[in-house]
């Protein structure tokens, strides 16, 4: 029986390309090579596509995916040249142009099956302001927030923050993930510098109420009504703020899997996770991040439609705790991608 082709897209145009490379390298090592051939394509910061490597067997531990200058010495190809009949694409891409619906729309035009969120679920979860409206509509609790726009009066925005929120607050670009561009603000004097930093990444910003809470995460897997959620895990920080470097570069975090929570609280988190996932028409996978306060209040922080897939990432570790290995998880995601593709094609008839 001939092997199936799994195409890995990695790199990308966003500030989160480092995470993408780390995730893609983990995937290429964990793939079941008795079933798949893996073909890799690097997307440069400028948006060019470069065919890099091809693996028919598990690569050596020291082998790395080509990136940046090394990859750019390879010939650039037309983006459409990644097409291969019956191949499945795993877009291991984070942030804008990766999990905002852009690459998903491109792959649908090519009529390729792909792992993860569709156009709607990608774009709606990537946009923090839109996501907040959706989750509010289905009754999933969230922390209070203020919306800010770069072209509005910044003094009036500051006044609204003072009236509606208490410090500390967190200032977040509406369309960015992995803590990129996010600042913790302890007083009014630091608000404008934090807004200026966030506006570098998006002209729409969310200012959220800070809460003294545990950070609890739940992994979701499935399509349509057949959706499963894991027991939750907890992010245990030894840094003051769980920023981009502490998440992915310095690895200054630890995780408790499963989280030390009551059965009732775990069930509530799982139900909120599945409700939020279905509300945005989730497909394939998502990681739902929650705050849990000392008095037991649960707030949804965000739904991450393409969560980190590195060897120390919460999403695969949560499923491993449920008995689903990393390699089997990848196969399940490929099968879900093919199922979604068939459904989409049938709806076009």
UniProtKB/Swiss-Prot annotation:
Residue ranges crossing the lipid bilayer per the database entry: none
Protein name in UniProt: D-alanine--D-alanine ligase
Binding site for ATP: 162-217
UniProt keyword list: ATP-binding, Cell shape, Cell wall biogenesis/degradation, Cytoplasm, Ligase, Magnesium, Manganese, Metal-binding, Nucleotide-binding, Peptidoglycan synthesis
Cofactor(s) essential for the protein: Mg(2+); Mn(2+)
Binding-site residues, Mg(2+) 2: 302, 304
Subcellular location: Cytoplasm
Any GO BP: cell wall organization
HAMAP family: Dala_Dala_lig
PROSITE patterns assigned: ATP_GRASP, DALA_DALA_LIGASE_1, DALA_DALA_LIGASE_2
Function: Cell wall formation.
Pfam families given in the database record: Dala_Dala_lig_C, Dala_Dala_lig_N
Listed pathway(s): Cell wall biogenesis; peptidoglycan biosynthesis
Residues annotated for Mg(2+) 1 binding in this entry: 289, 302
EC number: 6.3.2.4
UniProt catalytic activity: 2 D-alanine + ATP = D-alanyl-D-alanine + ADP + phosphate + H(+)
Family statement: Belongs to the D-alanine--D-alanine ligase family.
Record-level GO cellular component terms: cytosol
């Amino acid at each position: 029986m001939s092997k199936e082709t799994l195409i890995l897209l990695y790199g990308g145009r966003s500030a989160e390309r480092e995470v993408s490379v780390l995730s893609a390298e983990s995937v290429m090592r964990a793939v079941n090579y008795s079933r798949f051939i893996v073909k890799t394509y690097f997307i440069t910061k400028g948006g060019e596509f470069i065919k890099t490597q091809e693996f028919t067997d598990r690569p050596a531990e020291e082998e790395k995916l080509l990136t940046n200058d090394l990859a750019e010495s390879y010939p650039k190809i037309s983006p459409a040249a990644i097409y291969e009949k019956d191949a499945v694409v795993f877009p291991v891409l984070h942030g804008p142009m990766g999990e905002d619906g852009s690459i998903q729309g491109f792959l649908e035009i090519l009529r390729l099956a792909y792992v993860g969120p569709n156009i709607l679920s990608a774009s709606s979860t990537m946009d923090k302001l839109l996501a907040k409206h959706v989750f509010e509509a289905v009754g999933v609790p969230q922390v209070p927030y203020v919306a800010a726009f770069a072209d509005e009066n910044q003094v009036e925005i500051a006044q609204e923050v003072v009236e509606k929120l208490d410090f500390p607050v967190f200032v977040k670009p509406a369309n960015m993930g992995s803590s990129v561009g996010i600042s913790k603000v302890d007083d009014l004097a630091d608000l404008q510098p934090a807004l200026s930093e966030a506006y570098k990444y998006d002209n729409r910003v969310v200012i959220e109420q800070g809460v003294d809470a545990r950070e609890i995460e739940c992994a979701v897997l499935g399509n349509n009504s057949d959706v499963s959620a894991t027991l939750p895990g907890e992010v245990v920080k030894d840094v003051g703020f769980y920023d981009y470097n502490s998440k992915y570069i310095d690895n200054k975090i630890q995780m408790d899997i499963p989280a030390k929570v009551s059965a009732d609280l775990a069930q509530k988190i799982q139900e909120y996770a599945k409700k939020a996932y279905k509300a945005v028409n989730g497909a394939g996978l998502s990681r739902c991040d929650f705050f849990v306060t000392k008095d037991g209040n649960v707030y949804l922080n965000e739904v991450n439609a393409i969560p980190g897939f590195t060897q120390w990432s919460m999403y695969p570790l949560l499923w491993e705790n449920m008995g689903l290995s990393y390699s089997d998880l990848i196969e399940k995601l490929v099968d879900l991608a093919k199922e979604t593709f068939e459904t989409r094609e049938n709806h076009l008839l």
